[in-house]
Amino acid sequence: MNKKILETLEFDKVKALFEPHLLTEQGLEQLRQLAPTAKADKIKQAFAEMKEMQALFVEQPHFTILSTKEIAGVCKRLEMGADLNIEEFLLLKRVLLASRELQSFYANLENVSLEELAFWFEKLHDFPQLQGNLQAFNDAGFIENFASEELARIRRKIHDSESQVRDVLQDLLKQKAQMLTEGIVASRNGRQVLPVKNTYRNKIAGVVHDISASGNTVYIEPREVVKLSEEIASLRADERYEMLRILQEISERVRPHAAEIANDAWIIGHLDLIRAKVRFIQERQAVVPQLSENQEIQLLHVCHPLVKNAVANDVYFGQDLTAIVITGPNTGGKTIMLKTLGLTQVMAQSGLPILADKGSRVGIFEEIFADIGDEQSIEQSLSTFSSHMTNIVDILGKVNQHSLLLLDELGAGTDPQEGAALAMAILEDLRLRQIKTMATTHYPELKAYGIETAFVQNASMEFDTATLRPTYRFMQGVPGRSNAFEIAKRLGLSEVIVGDASQQIDQDNDVNRIIEQLEEQTLESRKRLDNIREVEQENLKMNRALKKLYNELNREKETELNKAREQAAEIVDMALSESDQILKNLHSKSQLKPHEIIEAKAKLKKLAPEKVDLSKNKVLQKAKKKRAPKVGDDIVVLSYGQRGTLTSQLKDGRWEAQVGLIKMTLEEKEFDLVQAQQEKAVKKKQVNVVKRTSGRGPQARLDLRGKRYEEAMNELDTFIDQALLNNMAQVDIIHGIGTGVIREGVTKYLQRNKHVKSFGYAPQNAGGSGATIVTFKG
């Protein structure tokens, strides 16, 4: 869309209204780049995003996003091979933290159906390794000691050397007190010195670093600390070199992910912008309009967003309506009405909410043109008429059926008769070309054109003759009328003079009386419509209140049910645990047959109440996830007090964590969680026993290929129980060859199981060492 219309309608000022609601520099940049589009799919997407964000705010009214700075330049430097400094790493660290918080928020989100927003939430990346690396930089811009073992070693040596210097100087302060001007340790040129009286300067061996202005004090670094100070200076150089190496190393680790991080930053900004739109809706009672497929416009109680205390008006630009001609005197708000229509269309086509009531519809226009104001006449020293005509000629050459045209004071600035004729001719040309046009004029001749011409409608701005002030109410379908006689009377002009004047234009008076009647009818209709709207608003408020109450009651009910289910589940679990222990004791002390033990266990399970399926229990899910650490969680290593990030879990249950550049192996008791991430729910896989029939009787097969070790062992245990219950004499276990870990686990399990008579690898033609055949005791 042409830039001139955006300047004329002051679209940048409108966009500035959304800035206070933004939290990120990425969102601010996207807002500033925002422009209207004629692509219906993009507009629909923007509208859908706003509606989903509104629904999200109903459930999460305090939803927020971590503030972030622009990182496009940082990522570009990385891609070009540059190494980052600490400040740049802190910007990236902030973006990764914002991304992780949004992912966690989305994972915990309930009772909201998302589609467009889900797409953005799910495109965010997870970088647990990088998060651990970036923990090396604290928010004060300091590289932590744990960033590398070498850095920690150097800083320990610096600390020890500085302690030695302090100790030596403190001893000298006591020993040489009478030779010093003050009993303090001073600092000169980065060295620790003693303030020695000039008369004793030769009594204390060392390096002179400064002399006081009076010459009475000489600042000497004692010989005893010179060597230590030189060591410290050397260590400081080593520290700087190691810090530079750390910056280079972490830059290399981040570099492959620069594009992904930049994309995450854009998504964060996009979500921030959508959030800002909804905050604007809440603040200004704006709405997401409907999108018309045929350029039909219906604006209910629409306001100009930049006008304080703006009067709300209705505008209906039907599919067949080509032109709306607003007639009547100046200063009544005609120009504001033009700008309101144009600006509302620009806002909607830019994916922004509009200041109107629900039920409002907007069209889609490829271009919006306007001739408003006298900018050209000032710039080019042209007359008002020449300025308008120059602009209109240019516009007429560009408009088509997909354009919206706004013309202010059409035909003004020349002879009234010629100006009116030109205005009608221009409107007729636009009508025949089916170009939607809203025009303002003060020529009375255009009233007749609006009445007599098909697909053209008159309109006016209401004027209160009692107060002699415009009300700024838009009256569609009612042409403007002159109020000169009424105003003259109220201002004290003689009734005789007013009467003489009115007799000279009897015909016009007849027209004015008709217009007056139309105004009265329009006002009456508006009052009725306002009353209907008030009732609708009350009904909407009542409906919202009832829905809110209903949802709250349902939540309370669900909470109580969940508590009861949890208690019941705990009781059942406790009973089953006790039954397992009893059966274990029986098995170790008695000669019960295997199938009798399994049958007894099954009977005990039947005695317990039916176990409630808590897989959908939100409370339990959150409690479990809160207790269990997961990959990507931030941790504090208890022995060091340093932060890191979990990167993987080992087979023995221990965890690998990235703490700066150091990778550590920790047990759960050696760290605390800082903020757990919500992992995606993983459906439990059932162990399926596939029965087959052959000459040897009932058999079964279990396939463990592709399973993790713990998962495979659990499935094997359940499978053997089921096989014994079915009195199977023999089963096949397919574990594959692979690394041999699962095969070895199967072997150890079968060796321990007292119900197994024998087992061995399958024949070569039946799987060989990739499968084990198990025979049970009779």
UniProtKB/Swiss-Prot annotation:
Q: Which positions are tagged coiled coil?
A: none
Q: How does it assemble?
A: Homodimer. Binds to stalled ribosomes, contacting rRNA.
What is the residue range of the signal peptide feature?
Answer: none
Gene Ontology MF annotations:
ATP binding; ATP hydrolysis activity; ATP-dependent DNA damage sensor activity; double-stranded DNA binding; endonuclease activity; mismatched DNA binding; ribosomal large subunit binding; rRNA binding
Domain annotation Smr: ranges: 702-777
Binding residue positions for ATP:
328-335
| Similarity comment: family membership | Belongs to the DNA mismatch repair MutS family. MutS2 subfamily.
Q: What is this protein called?
A: Endonuclease MutS2
Q: Which UniProt keywords apply?
A: ATP-binding, DNA-binding, Endonuclease, Hydrolase, Nuclease, Nucleotide-binding, RNA-binding, rRNA-binding
